[in-house]
């Protein structure tokens, strides 16, 4: 089987900066030397900021992390590139890894909505309003808070600029409100790393209704490899079978064109059994094949669904 991967979420830029590691080779979950078995690799790379920083300090830290990541890309320009659009991606040789930039937690705007234009100009194409708790824009998954007036302004500006909203860390009210705004503007929304709440109950996981709203918007949903999202507290470590359970559940919601992978590599501490890094994801594909998933469906979940979404942006 030929392996291709379009993964919707990793936190590698932050880890590279914080731990002073290289993108080419490291002991993290994502490194260029760990993707040699993939004939194509596309990654949405999120930039997150420490929660012991103020919003303004987090904004400054964002640029440090981004600039470090860009230097890593430049140091490996024969093997990796940052893309801003499908057209830029399509021009890359297949052996060049493509990274798209995301911001995880828009608190870095620090109340200045014009900063979203700076993020767009810097290459950011995906944005989540929260990581946890409440901020000036609205509520995270662990709250019941809705969008604030400022949050609605930011969402509208993001849509107008061409930044896709990621609702993975949003409260139920925020998800509903962003979905409503997206429907009015005929824009898709995504959940880059959110599993099925009906399989494993967790406030970060999606209800059937939330998944359906994302699907109906034309968006996609990535399967997270975080243990708590896969199996809750039912066991100390998740198995590949737990990943497949969430995939199968989403497929049962008519999600064959919606479900993708959003592994959350370098953002999770405990990976599923036998999957230590991106280098091991072929084991998931092989396990799916052993459960009679067609090669076409495996390819769709690993790569094609996300690529088709990218083409529409």
Language-model segment annotations:
Residues 276-313:
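Mid-to-C-terminal alpha-helical segments outside catalytic/metal-binding sites
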Residues 225, 254-278:
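Short acidic/histidine-rich active-site segments
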